[in-house]
């Protein structure tokens, strides 16, 4: 049985020719000829079974044989916002693996301790498309341009929002546990007063406390912020908490930025119905 060949054609239903880069791969690498079948994906939730109708030089024309709408593999909107590492290969690795695992949106943050302030998103787009084809995903994750941390959190004010960090002085709940079930209030030690930061986190957690499973609320937006190698600054963490983000950890291990990002995506993915 021949392996199905997948090609990314954003306007597959309205076009009849493969984009230049995909055509080159089809003709020069796979050596497709007239009559050969292939699968097209528009990155918007639909696959198309198609056949090569004509080839000419660098051009590869096709005819759609069948339209195959896909059902979402998860119901929420999974969004990772992360500060890029100094070595771009590591963020490129993250973009590839996160796409394979499954998520919806990648944002790049410019933070106080960021080691990189410029990112070429077209290359990340190519990596995401390649991973989307390899893992047979029907939806292409959105890749956003880098944005200042303060501006970013001011623009994201709805849905479940989390900031992962390592500061002991700001109380944290575990991200995976929080995603699996509605968080319970932080434990109170008798005779002890909460600091201002603890009060804010406690209030946020108590507002969503319930014995009902978290999964009861389907199709909701999840956003996790992951900082640079030097972590977010304490001021950035407090700013996010003030804006309604829940302070979380990603477990007991201290993780590299790209590993933390992938862990966050996997936790969001595993929390889906």
Description of each model-found segment:
Residues 189-191, 215-217:
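Glycine-biased, low-complexity coil/linker segments
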Residues 193, 200-203:
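Polybasic, lysine-rich low-complexity intrinsically disordered segments
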Residues 162-180, 221-239, 243-249:
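Active-site/ligand-binding-proximal alpha/beta "capping" segment
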Residues 233-273:
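Structured adenosyl-cofactor binding patch, chiefly the S-adenosyl-L-methionine
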């Amino acid at each position: 049985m021949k392996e199905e060949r997948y090609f990314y054609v954003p306007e597959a239903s309205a076009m009849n020719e493969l984009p230049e880069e995909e055509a080159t791969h089809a003709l020069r690498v796979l050596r497709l000829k007239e009559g050969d079948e292939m699968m097209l994906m528009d990155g918007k939730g639909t696959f198309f079974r198609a056949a090569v109708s004509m080839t000419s030089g660098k051009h590869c024309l096709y005819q759609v044989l069948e339209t195959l709408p896909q059902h979402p593999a998860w119901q929420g909107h999974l969004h990772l916002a992360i500060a890029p590492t100094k070595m771009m290969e590591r963020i490129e690795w993250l973009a590839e693996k996160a796409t394979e695992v499954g998520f919806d949106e990648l944002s790049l943050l410019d933070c106080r301790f960021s080691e990189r302030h410029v990112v070429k998103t077209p290359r990340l787009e190519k990596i995401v498309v390649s991973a989307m084809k390899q893992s047979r995903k029907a939806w292409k994750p959105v890749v956003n341009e880098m944005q200042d941390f303060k501006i970013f959190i001011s623009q994201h004010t709805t849905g479940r929002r989390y900031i992962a960090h390592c500061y002991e002085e700001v109380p944290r709940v575990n991200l995976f546990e929080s995603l699996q079930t509605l968080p319970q209030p932080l434990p109170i030690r008798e005779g002890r007063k909460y600091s201002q930061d603890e009060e804010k986190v406690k209030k946020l957690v108590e507002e969503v406390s319930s014995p009902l499973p978290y999964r009861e609320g389907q199709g909701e937006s999840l956003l996790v912020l992951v900082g640079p190698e030097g972590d977010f600054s304490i001021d950035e963490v407090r700013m996010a908490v003030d804006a309604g983000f829940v302070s979380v950890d990603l477990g007991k291990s201290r993780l590299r930025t790209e590993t933390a990002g992938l862990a966050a995506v996997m936790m969001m993915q595993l929390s889906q119905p």
